[in-house]
């Protein structure tokens, strides 16, 4: 059987498959379905400094080959995540976990990351810079290289854990933003977050989602994700996590050939809660089919 293990920012993973933040809760919810230790790791629900109740409903719209969501980072806040959610996770997951962090100011990001830095089970901090900067006219941190670099530098000051910056695809030049984060000290880049989308209810003549627009994800965005992973991984020297529309073992291989060291799976978990487990179990078959001995040998193999 081919070797599935990869090294992500100095931490060994049994395999490269990672459920994406926002599609896997805090992990323990899925532990009733299967042994989540089969996963490489997972990125838990986006966590902010203060509790957030999220956006008004409806928050979800179905699309051909995907979905739009505008959940609005609903979470109990970092204090409660540490006090209540992580202890439940420790009972069923015995590997380092990825903490996904969001914020609305540079100080927010630094505060939340500093709190999570003290948690032994947290292996990586995945910093979502797709949030609006309340001090920057509401523009997303991830759309401006300078703002993304500022968040990166602030987080690096308060943690010794690997910092992975999660980038938005809703930009003109994602490579410039990735390079700015790398220069500011990022240990890795994850991409892509959701694309901005909208659906309209023809009867009501109004947007389906109360927030009007939301994040479009699912198989339809996969080719865009592969292209951006390829571009970024060839421009930076730090590891890249690929995501966006991944739904089968072949997609994982394709992402890795494009340059990803590890691969996150998002919307597929909402369609099939066993998606990540099934993908991991199917990887040996796909590796055999394409004569791949180890996954490490294919990372960035497409020039």
Identify the meaning behind each predicted range:
Residues 1-97, 102-104, 279:
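N-terminal capping/small domains of soluble enzymes
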Residues 39-40, 45, 95, 122-125, ...:
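Short acidic/polar active-site loop segments enriched in Thr and Asp
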Residues 48-53, 132-134, 196-199, 270-272:
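Short gly/pro/ser/thr-enriched loop/turn and capping motifs at secondary-structure boundaries
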Residues 55-64, 200-214, 256, 268-293:
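C-terminal helical cap(s) of enzyme catalytic domains, especially alpha/beta-barrels
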Residues 104-241, 250-265:
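Alpha/beta enzyme core
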Residues 246:
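Short donor-sugar binding/catalytic loops of nucleotide-sugar-dependent glycosyltransferases
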Residues 296-303:
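A short, charged, Gly/Pro-tolerant segment at domain boundaries
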